Protein backbone atom coordinates (compact mmCIF):
# COMPACT_ATOMS: atom_id res chain seq x y z
CA UNK A 1 0.00 0.00 0.00
CA UNK A 2 1.68 3.19 -1.19
CA UNK A 3 1.54 6.62 0.45
CA UNK A 4 -1.32 7.67 -1.84
CA UNK A 5 -3.45 4.76 -0.63
CA UNK A 6 -2.60 5.60 2.98
CA UNK A 7 -3.58 9.23 2.43
CA UNK A 8 -6.78 8.13 0.69
CA UNK A 9 -7.64 5.85 3.62
CA UNK A 10 -7.13 8.73 6.04
CA UNK A 11 -9.34 11.09 4.02
CA UNK A 12 -12.01 8.45 3.48
CA UNK A 13 -11.96 7.44 7.15
CA UNK A 14 -12.23 11.06 8.29
CA UNK A 15 -15.04 11.75 5.83
CA UNK A 16 -16.98 8.76 7.13
CA UNK A 17 -16.58 9.92 10.72
CA UNK A 18 -14.04 7.27 11.70
CA UNK A 19 -10.79 9.15 12.33
CA UNK A 20 -9.55 6.64 14.90
CA UNK A 21 -10.02 3.73 12.49
CA UNK A 22 -8.23 5.60 9.71
CA UNK A 23 -5.36 6.48 12.05
CA UNK A 24 -4.95 2.90 13.29
CA UNK A 25 -5.05 1.53 9.75
CA UNK A 26 -2.51 4.08 8.59
CA UNK A 27 0.02 3.48 11.36
CA UNK A 28 -0.14 -0.29 10.87
CA UNK A 29 0.30 -0.01 7.11
CA UNK A 30 3.11 2.54 7.29
CA UNK A 31 4.92 0.46 9.93
CA UNK A 32 4.72 -2.68 7.77
CA UNK A 33 6.00 -0.77 4.72
CA UNK A 34 8.92 0.72 6.66
CA UNK A 35 9.88 -2.70 8.11
CA UNK A 36 9.79 -4.33 4.66
CA UNK A 37 11.75 -1.49 3.08
CA UNK A 38 14.39 -1.55 5.84
CA UNK A 39 15.52 -5.10 5.00
CA UNK A 40 18.22 -5.06 2.32
CA UNK A 41 18.45 -8.34 0.41
CA UNK A 42 21.46 -9.84 -1.35
CA UNK A 43 21.26 -9.65 -5.14
CA UNK A 44 22.36 -13.28 -5.56
CA UNK A 45 20.74 -15.13 -2.63
CA UNK A 46 17.85 -12.91 -1.60
CA UNK A 47 19.05 -13.30 2.01
CA UNK A 48 19.25 -10.28 4.32
CA UNK A 49 22.33 -8.04 4.30
CA UNK A 50 24.27 -7.72 6.42
CA UNK A 51 24.20 -11.23 7.91
CA UNK A 52 26.63 -13.38 9.85
CA UNK A 53 28.19 -16.65 8.70
CA UNK A 54 31.32 -18.59 9.63
CA UNK A 55 34.48 -19.60 7.78
CA UNK A 56 34.19 -23.15 6.43
CA UNK A 57 37.82 -23.50 5.41
CA UNK A 58 40.91 -23.62 7.59
CA UNK A 59 42.65 -21.32 5.10
CA UNK A 60 41.00 -18.72 2.86
CA UNK A 61 42.33 -15.83 0.79
CA UNK A 62 40.55 -12.56 1.54
CA UNK A 63 40.75 -10.69 -1.77
CA UNK A 64 40.51 -7.06 -2.75
CA UNK A 65 37.76 -7.79 -5.30
CA UNK A 66 35.28 -10.53 -6.31
CA UNK A 67 37.54 -12.71 -8.50
CA UNK A 68 40.69 -14.83 -8.19
CA UNK A 69 42.48 -12.23 -10.33
CA UNK A 70 42.26 -9.73 -7.46
CA UNK A 71 45.11 -9.32 -5.01
CA UNK A 72 45.05 -11.27 -1.72
CA UNK A 73 45.09 -8.79 1.18
CA UNK A 74 44.70 -11.26 4.06
CA UNK A 75 44.82 -15.01 4.63
CA UNK A 76 42.19 -16.21 7.12
CA UNK A 77 43.29 -19.30 9.05
CA UNK A 78 40.68 -19.83 11.78
CA UNK A 79 38.04 -22.33 10.73
CA UNK A 80 34.70 -21.32 12.25
CA UNK A 81 35.57 -17.63 12.68
CA UNK A 82 32.48 -15.43 12.44
CA UNK A 83 32.25 -13.12 9.43
CA UNK A 84 29.65 -10.57 8.41
CA UNK A 85 28.51 -10.64 4.77
CA UNK A 86 27.98 -7.06 3.58
CA UNK A 87 27.57 -7.57 -0.20
CA UNK A 88 27.17 -10.23 -2.88
CA UNK A 89 28.54 -10.37 -6.42
CA UNK A 90 27.99 -13.60 -8.36
CA UNK A 91 29.56 -16.41 -6.32
CA UNK A 92 31.56 -13.95 -4.19
CA UNK A 93 30.71 -12.40 -0.83
CA UNK A 94 32.21 -9.25 0.64
CA UNK A 95 32.85 -9.95 4.32
CA UNK A 96 34.01 -8.09 7.40
CA UNK A 97 35.83 -9.70 10.32
CA UNK A 98 35.80 -8.84 14.02
CA UNK A 99 38.70 -6.40 13.51
CA UNK A 100 36.83 -4.53 10.77
CA UNK A 101 38.97 -5.83 7.90
CA UNK A 102 36.98 -6.34 4.70
CA UNK A 103 37.49 -8.32 1.53
CA UNK A 104 35.94 -10.83 -0.83
CA UNK A 105 35.63 -14.61 -0.36
CA UNK A 106 34.17 -17.26 -2.66
CA UNK A 107 30.85 -18.47 -1.23
CA UNK A 108 32.13 -22.07 -0.98
CA UNK A 109 34.52 -20.96 1.80
CA UNK A 110 31.59 -19.92 4.01
CA UNK A 111 28.88 -21.78 5.88
CA UNK A 112 25.67 -20.68 7.55
CA UNK A 113 26.62 -22.05 10.98
CA UNK A 114 26.63 -19.22 13.50
CA UNK A 115 29.64 -18.65 15.71
CA UNK A 116 30.75 -15.86 18.01
CA UNK A 117 34.18 -14.53 18.92
CA UNK A 118 34.75 -13.37 22.49
CA UNK A 119 35.69 -9.67 22.47
CA UNK A 120 35.79 -9.14 26.24
CA UNK A 121 39.06 -9.83 28.08
CA UNK A 122 37.32 -12.66 29.97
CA UNK A 123 33.74 -13.77 29.38
CA UNK A 124 31.58 -15.50 31.99
CA UNK A 125 29.11 -17.93 30.43
CA UNK A 126 26.03 -18.07 32.66
CA UNK A 127 23.29 -20.62 33.36
CA UNK A 128 20.60 -18.10 32.32
CA UNK A 129 20.42 -14.83 30.39
CA UNK A 130 21.02 -12.70 33.47
CA UNK A 131 24.01 -11.07 35.20
CA UNK A 132 22.77 -12.72 38.41
CA UNK A 133 22.85 -16.27 36.98
CA UNK A 134 25.48 -18.80 38.03
CA UNK A 135 28.70 -18.86 35.97
CA UNK A 136 28.99 -22.19 34.13
CA UNK A 137 32.22 -21.55 32.18
CA UNK A 138 34.70 -18.83 31.26
CA UNK A 139 36.22 -17.93 27.89
CA UNK A 140 39.09 -15.61 27.00
CA UNK A 141 39.29 -12.96 24.29
CA UNK A 142 39.52 -14.49 20.81
CA UNK A 143 37.84 -17.81 21.66
CA UNK A 144 35.31 -18.88 19.01
CA UNK A 145 32.15 -20.64 20.20
CA UNK A 146 29.07 -21.90 18.35
CA UNK A 147 25.91 -19.82 18.85
CA UNK A 148 22.89 -21.90 19.84
CA UNK A 149 20.32 -19.11 20.12
CA UNK A 150 20.04 -15.37 20.73
CA UNK A 151 17.46 -13.23 22.51
CA UNK A 152 17.38 -9.44 22.82
CA UNK A 153 20.66 -8.82 24.70
CA UNK A 154 22.04 -12.34 25.20
CA UNK A 155 23.22 -15.35 23.19
CA UNK A 156 23.57 -18.96 24.33
CA UNK A 157 27.04 -20.11 23.27
CA UNK A 158 29.00 -23.34 23.34
CA UNK A 159 28.02 -26.97 23.36
CA UNK A 160 27.39 -29.60 25.99
CA UNK A 161 28.84 -28.88 29.42
CA UNK A 162 30.66 -25.74 28.24
CA UNK A 163 27.51 -23.94 27.14
CA UNK A 164 26.09 -20.82 28.70
CA UNK A 165 24.60 -17.39 28.14
CA UNK A 166 26.73 -14.36 27.26
CA UNK A 167 25.79 -10.70 26.78
CA UNK A 168 25.90 -9.67 23.11
CA UNK A 169 28.07 -6.70 24.06
CA UNK A 170 30.92 -9.13 24.96
CA UNK A 171 30.93 -11.08 21.66
CA UNK A 172 31.17 -10.48 17.90
CA UNK A 173 29.01 -12.52 15.54
CA UNK A 174 25.41 -11.53 16.35
CA UNK A 175 23.70 -8.22 15.61
CA UNK A 176 22.15 -6.27 18.48
CA UNK A 177 18.62 -6.64 17.05
CA UNK A 178 18.88 -10.33 16.15
CA UNK A 179 16.82 -13.04 17.81
CA UNK A 180 16.87 -16.64 16.65
Would you name each region that the model predicts?
Residues 67:
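Intrinsically disordered, low-complexity polar regions and short flexible loop motifs
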Residues 7-17:
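Bacterial N-terminal signal peptides
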Residues 22-64, 75-79, 86-89, 96-101, ...:
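SH3-family beta-barrel domains
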Amino acid sequence: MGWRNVAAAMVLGAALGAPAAAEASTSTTVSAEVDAAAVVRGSETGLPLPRYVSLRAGRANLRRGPATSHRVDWVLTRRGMPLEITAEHGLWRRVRDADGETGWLHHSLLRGDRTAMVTAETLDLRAAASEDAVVTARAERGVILPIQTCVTDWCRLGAGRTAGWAPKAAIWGAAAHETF
